[in-house]
């Protein structure tokens, strides 16, 4: 099995010192050999110097500016494909893996599907909240999943949404679907990628026997801001599983939800942010239409 695969791990970092040893250290203990590529998005801490000193076998692609999560990953994916990667393991800077995680995933690789482990919290004592609410609870055949899990059966389970903290992607998917969409800087780019996978009838699965950890429980939740509003509207507008008419209806439904929240919570500071986000949306309507067409085509977009 180990000779058959050439797996590159892509990690995008920005001021990642608090996690870097757990993240990269876990990869060094993998039962399947992994090539590690770090794309640093212009960190202002000691991240790049530390990696160069303590992890000389890691390929470090240091950027002079913050490209964002998606475009940083695209830099790494482009590099890995040029080196002959058969698979890409996208791993968050605040995530780490069990030694046998990749080994547990590979038997379920069909060349056409995204595979993910289950995501535990950084403490490892419970499921990550996002994973539980979106991947697990939206899994197909949920009752069968519970039965299988209880008696120790091993399967993969289809679901609609898994955040990109730990994704295993075969080269074929990248060649046919492409990289992350440049219309997103940070957040929502993984949801857009899942929309594209579903549109093109590619699988999205998780394997309960494979485990990764995502340490975000202690990260303070950011307040609602203009960038979030803008990206949520873009996400709805360019979802190719919806017609243009329905996509715009979903965008306006989101706008109404913000207005209701502003009134209910008496957070009237939302209103100028929403107004500015809508102005930005008005300027990218044609770009959104063109982007939708691009996503519908089979090609290695943005790589």
Give the positions of each predicted feature.
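Short, flexible, basic/aromatic active-site loop/helix in glycosyltransferases
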Residues: 135-159
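Non-catalytic, C-terminal membrane-associated alpha-helical segments of glycosyltransferases
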Residues: 226-233, 243-303
């Amino acid at each position: 099995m180990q000779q058959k695969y050439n797996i590159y791990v892509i990690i995008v970092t920005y001021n990642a010192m608090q996690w870097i040893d757990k993240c990269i250290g876990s990869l060094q203990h993998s039962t399947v050999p992994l090539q590690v590529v770090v794309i640093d998005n212009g960190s202002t801490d000691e991240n790049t110097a530390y990696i160069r000193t303590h992890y000389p076998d890691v390929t470090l692609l240091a950027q002079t500016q913050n490209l964002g999560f998606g475009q940083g990953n695209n830099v790494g994916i482009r590099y890995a494909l040029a080196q002959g990667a058969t698979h890409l393991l996208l791993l968050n800077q605040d995530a780490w893996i069990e030694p046998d995680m990749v080994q547990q995933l590979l038997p379920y690789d069909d060349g056409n599907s995204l595979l993910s482990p289950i995501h535990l919290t950084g403490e490892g004592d419970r499921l990550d909240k996002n994973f539980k609410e979106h991947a697990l609870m939206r899994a197909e055949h949920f009752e069968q999943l519970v039965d299988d899990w209880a008696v120790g059966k091993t399967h993969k389970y289809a679901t609609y949404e898994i955040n990109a903290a730990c994704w295993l992607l075969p080269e074929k998917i990248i060649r046919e679907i492409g990289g992350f969409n440049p219309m997103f800087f940070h957040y929502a780019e993984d949801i857009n990628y899942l929309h594209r996978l579903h549109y093109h009838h590619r699988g999205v699965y998780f394997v309960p026997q494979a485990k990764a950890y995502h340490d975000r429980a202690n990260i303070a939740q950011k307040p609602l801001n203009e960038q979030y509003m803008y990206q949520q509207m873009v996400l709805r507008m360019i979802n190719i599983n919806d017609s243009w008419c329905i996509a715009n209806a979903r965008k306006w439904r989101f706008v109404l939800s913000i207005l209701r929240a502003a009134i209910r919570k008496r957070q009237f500071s939302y209103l100028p942010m929403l107004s500015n986000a809508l102005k930005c949306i008005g300027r990218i309507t044609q770009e959104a239409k063109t982007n939708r067409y691009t996503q519908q085509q089979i090609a290695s977009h943005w790589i």
